[in-house]
Every structure is written in structure tokens, then in C-alpha cells.
């Protein structure tokens, strides 16, 4: 029982004796079930479930969750069954144990498919009982703490998965301390050198800032004491992964991040929060537009606080978060606070209500998604959103991810409104459907009977619900709709000089024979469903009179599906490669010009969908494509030679290389090179990223 002691010390502080007794029983069952099993480190396996239970006990979670944590690997790794668990510990604990089990017994074509399907199962198990994910997050936290005994490649894979899925999931559920620990451990495992460098410079910077921190802390405490406001004031340290992300994603310099002095003020009630805000603004000058009220409008994960940014002593930036004790606990524990042990029942917390709402949307996604991959991508985009808050004409607040458009808003209000949307008014003014919204706007959707979604909407909507619902409807297009759409596309591709009814019947029959189709309607349906390209069919029907010159390729697979006999040009502005989302337009003399969907030169193409067409890469193409990357490096002797040598090892050829000095120590290299597809390019960039002199690698396109 000595291994149980660490857990026992934690639960003695808040659980009654009868529940502690049941936990001891669960420990003994788990210990006996895992008898003889060891972890990669050589320790007895039972140390892992005990550690997971301890993480949850530190959050003061209920005894059923702790019992399930102790037993969470029993069904998967031992002969014990669900029925055994139910008989010994009741249905609730048995369901939790079964929900947490990894369920990897099914056979999949590859590891990626298995991972995507397991993720799908995990999310669905979480929807049934959110305690499943609390146990899973604690399980992942302990696994991250003990990564050292694994192979380096396995460490990196687990760390990347943690940063992409588990840490954002903890954030989405408001469990801040778990999210932070997962980020720090994942960062250290994935980028050990960067972690070490940032840790050292942060340590040095914090030492230099002590005097200023103490001065600001004293001034804040003094002002609030004068105002008779009881409070607790503390400095707020920035975490290493947060600093790294700001340096990489926002291209901020280290010192500009560390020069911000951050503090937290904890008070007794929400009214006092606003009094403290007034005192802060009389002490230091507030920065316009930098006050955020998350008390009146909480974040999606239930987080509540007042944020203000001010100019402090000697002009230094000062950020202050103001919240109550309850809000502080919610900020740290999120939905986990709902299952913290309480002697008396309580109503659901804000975080719990919001989490349930989010999980309901996951159920809808599960029903709409065509595959595990589509589902995992939709959920990942929904895990870590920057939110905006807009209003319906009736004044209801609607929460949307940053970058959301009126179409996202329409689907957030109701699926039927999204499907029937034909226009929008924002703040009573006409507003483009593709233009992003900003917080505080009032949005009104204009609908029309019989209207339906435009496939081009998928190019600008950002919410997972909108994407899933649009895809679902487009997949279910009836044959008549496909024929009608195909007719319009083909007539447009034929140009103004000829229409379909002017094409000789023998030409149509020859094209039907070529495509092995029976009727003209079959051909039009294929075009409408995107299985055949209207410009290619138009060219064949006109005997080469179309504006697309014939292809010069005489052998091998064409890179674009269905473009046989057509000249293809890849736009040099964005240099798309297989795997990129692409769109095409016809250009006289250049044939079919392929652009990346986000290319600036075709921005706004959604307004003229008739001029553009959706195209797909041919999976069997063996062609190499030219793309461009940007590498930021320290200006050390031999760095450039090492860079080119690293690229040569990836079977890529360098077409051109230009450098540009940023400052005395850092320069940027712009490299045009060959890549077979996005996977090949990712391998090249990964090879470069681990070089000691490299700061940052990005793909360079307009």
C-alpha cells in the first residue's frame, strides 16, 4: 500500500472516509491487475495510474473520477472486463474506465487513419461524460512528465500530438494549469535547444526586472489600500511556450515580449472588479481600445476577468487582470471545477454550460463529417479559437471564431438560415458575405426561399459548423441540380460564340463514348458534381476551338485530375504544389492557370465564381514543382553552406537562393527549390528547422 500513500495524503483533505475506503479497494484491484507489468522506465506499471489519480486529486475531483483514473488501463491491458468493473465499482465508474480505454483494437490502413479514428472516439466518449477527457488529460500529463525513457522519434511524435490536440483541448475546457504544463513539456520535448535558450534568457531577464516589478506591485497595492479595497495582488509570469509562439507567429522580438509587466488582482466580488479597474486607470494612463470585459461576455471556455493595458512608470507597458476568487479558480480549473468534490449539490457553472454547448456542436460535426480526417481537422480548428462577439438584431450575443464571416454567423444562428442566406447587413449597411466580422457588430442575414449554399463559400468560412453543413448539403445535391449546374458550367466554358444546343450531335456522342457515359444528362451531371472539368469537355466538343491551347505533354500523368489534353500553367505568384488547396481559371495562351486558393492575385474570386473552377491534384503524378521558402538564420560562418547541404540530402534541387540582412546578427534566405508535394516540402522544412543556426522556416508565397 506504500504507493497509495501519495494519493491518500491528497484525498484525506477533502473526501469522507467511506469514499476513501472505496478508493483503496480500487487501488488494490488495479495493483493486482497490473502485477508484473512495468513502464518503459522500468518502474512498476501501477505507479502510472496512481500518478494520474494524484493529478486529479490535486484538482479535488470526485471519488468516481479518481477510481476510474486508478483503473483506466485495466480493461485495455489486463484480462479484466467491463462487467468486472461494473460489478465491483458500479456502472458510472465502469463507463468512465471504458470511455478512457484507447479502443485501438480495430485495424486501419495506416497509423494516421488509426490516430484520426481514435481521436474521433475520444471526442465522442468525452461528449457522453466530460470526466473521460479530464482523466485522459491527466493521463497525458503524466506521460509527458515521464517522456525521458522513450526513443527520440517517439518523444517528438507524442510531444507534437500534445501541442496540437491535448493542450488546446485543455484550453478549450478552461483547465489552464494542465494546458500550461502540457505546453511547457511538449515544447521542451519537441524543441529542446530552443527551450533551453529561451529558458536561460528568460531567467536573466527576470533577474533584471525585479526592481521594476516590486515598484509597480507596491504602487498598485498602495492605491487599492487607500481606496479601501481588500485584494490580493501578484505578478504574472509569461510561460516559455507562450513567449516562443509570440516570437514565431507574431514575429515579436524577445525583449518586446518581456518588457510587458503583467499583474493579477483578486477581489471578493464582480462589482469590486470594476472599482479596481477605475483605480488602475487613475493610477496609470490606459491605452485606448485595450480594455477587455470578459466578465460581461465570458470566453467560450467560461473564463471571466477584466483585462486592461496601461502605460506605467517610465513608460513601461503594464497589463492587469482583475477577477474574483471564484473566477480565478474557474480560470485555473475550467469545467473540472464542476466535478470538484462538494458536500452540497450546486448548479452547473458557466464553464460547464458552455462546454456542454460546445460538445453538442461536436455531435453535429460527427454526424456531418464524411471521414475521421475531416472530423479531426474540423475539431482542431475549433479547439483553440480566438473569439469575436457579434449581435443579432434582437441583441443576442453570438460567439464566433476570429475571421468569421456573415455566412459563419448565419450557420451559428441556425442551419436553415445558413442554407437560405443570400446577403447580409452589418450595422444596417450592406456587407459582403466573404468579409470577416469584428466584435461588437450587429449582423442581420438576408434569406430567400429556395436559395442554397454556394460551393465557393468553403473558401472563406472559418467555423467548423458552417464548413460541415455546407459540405453535407453539397454532397447531397440531387441529380437534377447537378445536371442544371453542369449545363450552366458547360455553356459558360463554351463561351459566348456557341451554346450547347448548337454543338453537333456526333461531337456530343464522341465525348459520351470517350467518357463511357450513356446520355448528355449523365455528362452534365458529371460536370455538376465536379467529376469532369467543363473546360476540357468544352474543348473536346468544339474540336479544339476553345481558348485553351492543347497540352504539350506526351507521356506520364498530368498533375491535375481530368485535364487530359489541356495546357496547364502553375501560377508563379503563389507556386502551388500537390496537397495545396487549388483553384483554376482559363487564360488565353496559358491554358488552365492553377493558383493556391489563398493567393492574393485571385482574392475576391468568390464574387465571380463563374470565372473560376474547382480542380484537384492527380494523386499519381510524379512531377516535381518549384516552390519557395524563407529561412531566417544567425549570421554565423558556414551557416549558408550547411543549409544548402541539408537541402541536398532531401532529394530537392535548389533553383535560386537570395539573401537579405535583417540586422547585424540575422539574415533571411529566400530559396526556390523543387518539391514533389506538401509532404516532401514538410520534410525539407523539418530538416532545416532542426539546424542550430536556424531561427525560423516558412513557406514563402504571396
Swiss-Prot record:
- Phenotypic effect of disruption: In the presence of wild-type relA, spoT cannot be deleted because ppGpp accumulation is toxic. In the double relA/spoT deletion (a ppGpp0 mutant) there is a very large increase in biofilm formation (in a csrA-disrupted background). The ppGpp0 mutant makes decreased levels of CsrA and its inhibitory small RNAs (sRNA) CsrB and CsrC. The double relA/spoT deletion obviates persister cell formation in a hipA7 mutant.
InterPro entries this protein is in? Answer: ACT-like_dom_sf, ACT_dom, Beta-grasp_dom_sf, HD/PDEase_dom, HD_domain, NT_sf, RelA/Spo_fam, RelA/SpoT_AH_RIS
Q: Which residues form the ACT domain?
A: 628-702
Identify the pathway.
Answer: Purine metabolism; ppGpp biosynthesis; ppGpp from GDP: step 1/1; Purine metabolism; ppGpp biosynthesis; ppGpp from GTP: step 1/2
Database matches in PROSITE patterns: ACT (PS51671), HD (PS51831), TGS (PS51880)
Q: Where in the cell is it found?
A: Cytoplasm
GO CC aspect terms: cytosol
Q: Which residues form the TGS domain?
A: 386-447
Residue ranges annotated for the HD domain, each copy included: 45-144
Could you say which EC number(s) this protein's record lists? 2.7.6.5, 3.1.7.2
Cofactor requirement:
Mn(2+)
SUBUNIT field: Interacts with ObgE/CgtA (AC P42641); this association is not required for pre-50S ribosome binding. Under both amino acid and carbon starvation conditions about half of the protein dissociates from the ribosome.
Name of the protein described by the UniProt record: Bifunctional (p)ppGpp synthase/hydrolase SpoT
What is the native source organism of this protein? Escherichia coli (strain K12)
UniProt lineage: Bacteria, Pseudomonadati, Pseudomonadota, Gammaproteobacteria, Enterobacterales
Amino acid at each position: 500500500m506504500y504507493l497509495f500513500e501519495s494519493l491518500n495524503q491528497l484525498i484525506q483533505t477533502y473526501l469522507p472516509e467511506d469514499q476513501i475506503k472505496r478508493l483503496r479497494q480500487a487501488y488494490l484491484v488495479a495493483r493486482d491487475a497490473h502485477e508484473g507489468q512495468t513502464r518503459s522506465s522500468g518502474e512498476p506499471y501501477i505507479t502510472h495510474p496512481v500518478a494520474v489519480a494524484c493529478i486529479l486529486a490535486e484538482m479535488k475531483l470526485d471519488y468516481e473520477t479518481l477510481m476510474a483514473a486508478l483503473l483506466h488501463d485495466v480493461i485495455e491491458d489486463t484480462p479484466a472486463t467491463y462487467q468486472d468493473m461494473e460489478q465491483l465499482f458500479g456502472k458510472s465508474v465502469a463507463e468512465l474506465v471504458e470511455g478512457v480505454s484507447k479502443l485501438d483494437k480495430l485495424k486501419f490502413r495506416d497509423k494516421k487513419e488509426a490516430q484520426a479514428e481514435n481521436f474521433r472516439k475520444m471526442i465522442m466518449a468525452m461528449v457522453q461524460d466530460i470526466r473521460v477527457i479530464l482523466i485522459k488529460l491527466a493521463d497525458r500529463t503524466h506521460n509527458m512528465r515521464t517522456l525521458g525513457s522513450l526513443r527520440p522519434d517517439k518523444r517528438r511524435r507524442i510531444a507534437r500530438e500534445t501541442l496540437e490536440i491535448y493542450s488546446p483541448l485543455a484550453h478549450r475546457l478552461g483547465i489552464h494549469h494542465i494546458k500550461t504544463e502540457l505546453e511547457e513539456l511538449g515544447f521542451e520535448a519537441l524543441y529542446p535547444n530552443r527551450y533551453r535558450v529561451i529558458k536561460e534568457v528568460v531567467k536573466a531577464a527576470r533577474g533584471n526586472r525585479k526592481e521594476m516589478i516590486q515598484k509597480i506591485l507596491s504602487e498598485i497595492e498602495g492605491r487599492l489600500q487607500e481606496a479601501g479595497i481588500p485584494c490580493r495582488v501578484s505578478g504574472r509570469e509569461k510561460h516559455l511556450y507562450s513567449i516562443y509562439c509570440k516570437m514565431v507567429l507574431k514575429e515579436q522580438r524577445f525583449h518586446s515580449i518581456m518588457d510587458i509587466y503583467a499583474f493579477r488582482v483578486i477581489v471578493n466580488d464582480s462589482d469590486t472588479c470594476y472599482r479596481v479597474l477605475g483605480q488602475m486607470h487613475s493610477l496609470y494612463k490606459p491605452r485606448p481600445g485595450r480594455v477587455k470585459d470578459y466578465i460581461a461576455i465570458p470566453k467560450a471556455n467560461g473564463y471571466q476577468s477584466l483585462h486592461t493595458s496601461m502605460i506605467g512608470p517610465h513608460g513601461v507597458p503594464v497589463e492587469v487582470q482583475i477577477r474574483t476568487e471564484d473566477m480565478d479558480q474557474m480560470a485555473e480549473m475550467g469545467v473540472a471545477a464542476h466535478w470538484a468534490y462538494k458536500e452540497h449539490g450546486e448548479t452547473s457553472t458557466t464553464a460547464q454550460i458552455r462546454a456542454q454547448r460546445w460538445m453538442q456542436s461536436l455531435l453535429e460535426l460527427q454526424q456531418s463529417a464524411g471521414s475521421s480526417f475531416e472530423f479531426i481537422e474540423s475539431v482542431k480548428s475549433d479547439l483553440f479559437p480566438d473569439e469575436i462577439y457579434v449581435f443579432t438584431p434582437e441583441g443576442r450575443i453570438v460567439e464566433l471564431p476570429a475571421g468569421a464571416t456573415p455566412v459563419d454567423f448565419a450557420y451559428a444562428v441556425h442551419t436553415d438560415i445558413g442554407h437560405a442566406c443570400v446577403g447580409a447587413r452589418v450595422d444596417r449597411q450592406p456587407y459582403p458575405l466573404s468579409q470577416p466580422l469584428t466584435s461588437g457588430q450587429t449582423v442581420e442575414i438576408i434569406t430567400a426561399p429556395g436559395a442554397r449554399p454556394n460551393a465557393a463559400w468553403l473558401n472563406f468560412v472559418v467555423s467548423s459548423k458552417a464548413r460541415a453543413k455546407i459540405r453535407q448539403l453539397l454532397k447531397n445535391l440531387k441529380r437534377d441540380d447537378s445536371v442544371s449546374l453542369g449545363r450552366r458550367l458547360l455553356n459558360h466554358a463554351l463561351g459566348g460564340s456557341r451554346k450547347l444546343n448548337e454543338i453537333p450531335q456526333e461531337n456530343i456522342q464522341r465525348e459520351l463514348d470517350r467518357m463511357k457515359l450513356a446520355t448528355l444528362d449523365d455528362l452534365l451531371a458529371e460536370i455538376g458534381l465536379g467529376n469532369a472539368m467543363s473546360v476540357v469537355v468544352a474543348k473536346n466538343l468544339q474540336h479544339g476551338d476553345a481558348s485553351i491551347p492543347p497540352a504539350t505533354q506526351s507521356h506520364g500523368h498530368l498533375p491535375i485530375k481530368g485535364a487530359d489534353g489541356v495546357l496547364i500553367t502553375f501560377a508563379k505568384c503563389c507556386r502551388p504544389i500537390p496537397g495545396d488547396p487549388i483553384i483554376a481559371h482559363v487564360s488565353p495562351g496559358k491554358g488552365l492557370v492553377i493558383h493556391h486558393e489563398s493567393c492574393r492575385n485571385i482574392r475576391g474570386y468568390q464574387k465571380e465564381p463563374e470565372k473560376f473552377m474547382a480542380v484537384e491534384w492527380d494523386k499519381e503524378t510524379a512531377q516535381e514543382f518549384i516552390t519557395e521558402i524563407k529561412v531566417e538564420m544567425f549570421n554565423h560562418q558556414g551557416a549558408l553552406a550547411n543549409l544548402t547541404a541539408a537541402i541536398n540530402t532531401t532529394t530537392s534541387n535548389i533553383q535560386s537562393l537570395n539573401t537579405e540582412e535583417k540586422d547585424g546578427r540575422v539574415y533571411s534566405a529566400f530559396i526556390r527549390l523543387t518539391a514533389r508535394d506538401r509532404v516532401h516540402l514538410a520534410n525539407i522544412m523539418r530538416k532545416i528547422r532542426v539546424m542550430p543556426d536556424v531561427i525560423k522556416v516558412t513557406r514563402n508565397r504571396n
